[in-house]
Amino acid sequence: MSKPPHSSEHPHHDHHDHNPHDWHSPEYVSKWADGQDQKELDRQDAFRLLAETIPYDKSLPIRILDVGAGYGALTQFLLQYFPNATAVCQDGSEEMIKLGRYRLASQHGRFTCVLSNFSKSGWSRELTGHFEAVVSSIAIHNVNSPNIIRGIYDEIFPLVKPGGCFLNYDLIQPPWEDQLKWVKQAGFADVKFFWKDERRALFGGFKR
């Protein structure tokens, strides 16, 4: 099993930032992304543990949904880890999706992007088909609302194929167990923390 993520990481999309993010500004998104390279290196251990937890052989042509994909850092890692996989990158920022298409150019033909706002009920209607794995990285916490987070998990469950999984690497607030409860209430089984420290965790469950 991979070692846990480096404690020096300062993940993006942190709602504790003093300056609010403007994900609809091309200038802001470009400047923000330029500062992410070191953080992306720091996240590699978390991404690797997430990939190892997906219950499919690396050679299989699985379909992955990255919720709040941003510029595609997690998608990039997973498409390299699963060389026959394809991915859908969902995000609520058109500018971030543009940046994701640019940064994922080496994976041309293996990914598509969907613009929808997961803080709004019904966001998943923009997606088609089902997925062996639905994943997310440092994104869902941004809604900063337990009710909305529960709604996101509820909409994710029908998207997952039986035998598949939902895995979320995110900043979380106490009480910690609420996150597991909400994932269970959405319908997932064998829900647990796969790793956590004082402010971040990798957690999720499986669809029987």
Q: In which residue ranges do the predicted regions lie?
A:
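Core SAM-dependent methyltransferase catalytic element
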Residues: 195-208
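Conserved class I S-adenosyl-L-methionine
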Residues: 2-57
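A short glycine-rich, Lys/Arg-flanked "PGG" loop and its adjoining helix->strand segment in the class I
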Residues: 150-162
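Conserved beta-strand signature within the Rossmann-like core of class I S-adenosyl-L-methionine
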Residues: 163-170
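Class I SAM-dependent methyltransferase SAM/SAH-binding core
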Residues: 65, 71-121
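A short SAM/SAH-binding and catalytic strip from SAM-dependent methyltransferases
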Residues: 132-147
